[in-house]
């Protein structure tokens, strides 16, 4: 354990969208000489990623309430009180100078416990529409960080920081000018794949004239890669289909255009990589946050927002034809995306935490 006054507690769990930006901040804290501890729950992805990063993981028992039965709802107050007490015990033991929350079920009880222990609380919201836990924790927080402008109401606490993303994404890709080669299309559906995109892209690309058709690199998810490859074959479209892309920085560096969902980190990574995109938000995301994320790039002209309900193969093919016939349009969109990036997001969030800890 680090010397007293050098511990930081990070709270993040459930999905990679919460955990990956938190890990980026953890590395920055460590680079500045702080010992980072992690608060999570037993079921989230943090149980795999945090130990892999060599960080001590502390667990509390808490889960979400959406879609739960009446018995679970009746038990909820007792479960939450128990989780707060568990988190308070951990905070008292670690004596962190600051608690930094990135969302997930763990953040609510952990944030309340931080306030009870008198430890400064900073929250970071990755999406353009704030999650429930972060919205409720605003009054208890010393600072509220937002990835996208105006996610929270204006106040002295609010700071627009961007999302912490991998620094290698900000490196300029040395691409051959578009007029001298075929365009390159990257299709992303997340690590598990997005089956509607897997079905849509082969059909849409078959309607793009062969002379204009881009090279295609498609991440389809482990379960869906074989059938997606078969769909491309049946459509007469050449494509490289993979279950999962391990080196996203390389994939972004290769691409000229991306078709994907609109998760918070994906949107931030597209800006960091300076890539134009066609964003098809997940229709059933909580609070429709993916549509709000997509609007951030679309409003500025860095992306096209294409709702799944109204985007068929013909509509997507029409949009692809439009940009593939105008390479200069892709170049303008790429420049706009890069201008929206926040390369200092990680260091800014850590600066804010240490400011409230020692200020």
Curated annotation (Swiss-Prot):
It is found in: Cell inner membrane. Pathway: Cell wall biogenesis; peptidoglycan biosynthesis. GO terms for cellular component: plasma membrane. Keywords: Cell cycle, Cell division, Cell inner membrane, Cell membrane, Cell shape, Cell wall biogenesis/degradation, Glycosyltransferase, Membrane, Peptidoglycan synthesis, Transferase. One of its GO terms (biological process) is lipid glycosylation. Belongs to the glycosyltransferase 28 family. MurG subfamily. This is UDP-N-acetylglucosamine--N-acetylmuramyl-(pentapeptide) pyrophosphoryl-undecaprenol N-acetylglucosamine transferase. It comes from Pseudomonas putida (strain ATCC 47054 / DSM 6125 / CFBP 8728 / NCIMB 11950 / KT2440).
């Amino acid at each position: 354990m680090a010397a007293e006054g050098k511990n930081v507690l990070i709270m993040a769990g459930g999905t990679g969208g919460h955990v990956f930006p938190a890990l980026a901040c953890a590395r920055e804290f460590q680079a500045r000489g702080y010992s980072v501890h992690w608060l999570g729950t037993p079921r989230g992805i943090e149980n795999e990623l945090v130990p892999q990063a060599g960080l001590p993981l502390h667990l509390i028992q808490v889960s979400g309430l959406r879609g739960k039965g009446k018995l679970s709802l009746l038990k909820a107050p007792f479960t939450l009180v128990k989780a707060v007490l568990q988190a308070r015990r951990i905070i008292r033991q670690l004596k962190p100078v600051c608690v930094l929350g990135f969302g997930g079920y763990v953040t609510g009880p952990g944030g309340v416990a931080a306030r009870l222990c008198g430890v400064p609380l900073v929250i970071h919201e990755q999406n353009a529409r704030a999650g429930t836990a972060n919205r409720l924790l605003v009054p208890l927080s010393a600072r509220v960080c937002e990835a996208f402008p105006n996610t929270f109401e204006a106040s002295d606490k609010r700071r627009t920081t961007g999302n912490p993303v991998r620094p290698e994404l900000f490196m300029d890709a040395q691409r051959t000018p578009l007029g001298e080669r075929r365009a390159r299309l990257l299709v992303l559906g997340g690590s598990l794949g997005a089956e509607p995109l897997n079905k849509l892209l082969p059909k849409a690309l078959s309607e793009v004239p062969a002379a204009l058709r881009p090279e295609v690199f498609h991440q389809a998810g482990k379960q869906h890669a074989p059938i997606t490859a078969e769909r491309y074959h049946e459509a007469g479209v050449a494509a490289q289909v993979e279950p999962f892309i391990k080196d996203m920085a390389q994939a972004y560096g290769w691409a000229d255009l991306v078709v994907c969902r609109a998760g918070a980190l994906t949107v931030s990574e597209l800006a960091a990589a300076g890539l134009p995109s066609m964003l098809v938000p997940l229709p059933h995301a909580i609070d429709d946050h993916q549509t709000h994320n997509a609007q951030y790039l679309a409003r500025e002209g860095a992306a096209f927002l294409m709702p799944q309900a109204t985007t068929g193969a013909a509509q997507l093919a029409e949009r692809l034809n439009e940009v593939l016939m105008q390479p200069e349009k892709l170049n303008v969109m790429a420049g706009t995306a890069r201008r929206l990036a926040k390369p200092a997001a990680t260091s800014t969030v850590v600066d804010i935490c240490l400011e409230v800890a020692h200020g």
